[in-house]
């Protein structure tokens, strides 16, 4: 059997090697039992995918972007995120590992200021790695930002050659490739495990993890359902961005690959109304996962997608007998900045 065109193209695109290998898949037996046992719950652990500063989904995506940056002779990665951004921590990590510099604009995406919020967690790790961290008062938005443009020009003015990486490594020509390849990786693991995951749950904000997974699922043609859980609080913008990235990624890999609007499923019931702030359902979901399978999530992303998965199972929205795969995108370092939400947890 010949290799599909999209796979041939995907394998031809240069990338760095920042991951240990395939991210592990673990069964969640206790959470499965607590939720009734009618569907089996598993997790694919992007939080365990790399040795670079706690890894995470962004490291997988950045394998392609850093290869592109190096091919273009760039010496400084310039990007943006919130104060507790997993992405900017990952950008700094891959820069250090690649002998590059990193300039990260850390905006006030979350309208709270708990004690030490801008001193602990992800931003502490970025500073520890020697990143050029620049605090900024701009609020949350997944669009391209002027502050990042200013940082880019500043690097140029000082004689550097910057490479721009948008928030989440998402709205970039190569942003969806990491998670398209994730589906290819998953299919190989399924063959080894003797299981097929009917439903995949993924958190969605800047959109490329969700979009890449959709492209991979459509391309393989195995009727796998990808459910995005919005954590942006701006679901219309997120849905549009996921569809845009998915279509651009598909076009890059195979012009015959069609992504339809209905391929992008985004459940908008669990974002708590705003990016970066957990509600009672988020916190309850985090505690349940932690107290059943010692499965640690964060209050910004994974806590909200965990809340989504738990409610979908409880509602019976997932067909009995299904194997559900939750993508753990990482992000636990941010938990250190949210201790005020967990008094004597």
Curated annotation (Swiss-Prot):
PANTHER family: 1-AMINOCYCLOPROPANE-1-CARBOXYLATE DEAMINASE-RELATED. The modification N6-(pyridoxal phosphate)lysine is found at residue 58. It holds the Pfam family PALP. This is Probable 1-aminocyclopropane-1-carboxylate deaminase. One of its GO terms (biological process) is amine catabolic process. GO terms for molecular function: 1-aminocyclopropane-1-carboxylate deaminase activity; D-cysteine desulfhydrase activity; pyridoxal phosphate binding. Belongs to the ACC deaminase/D-cysteine desulfhydrase family. The active site is at residue 85. Keywords: Hydrolase, Pyridoxal phosphate. NCBIfam families: ACC_deam (TIGR01274). It catalyses: 1-aminocyclopropane-1-carboxylate + H2O = 2-oxobutanoate + NH4(+). Its EC number is 3.5.99.7. The keyword Hydrolase applies. Its cofactor is pyridoxal 5'-phosphate. Catalyzes a cyclopropane ring-opening reaction, the irreversible conversion of 1-aminocyclopropane-1-carboxylate (ACC) to ammonia and alpha-ketobutyrate. The keyword Hydrolase applies.
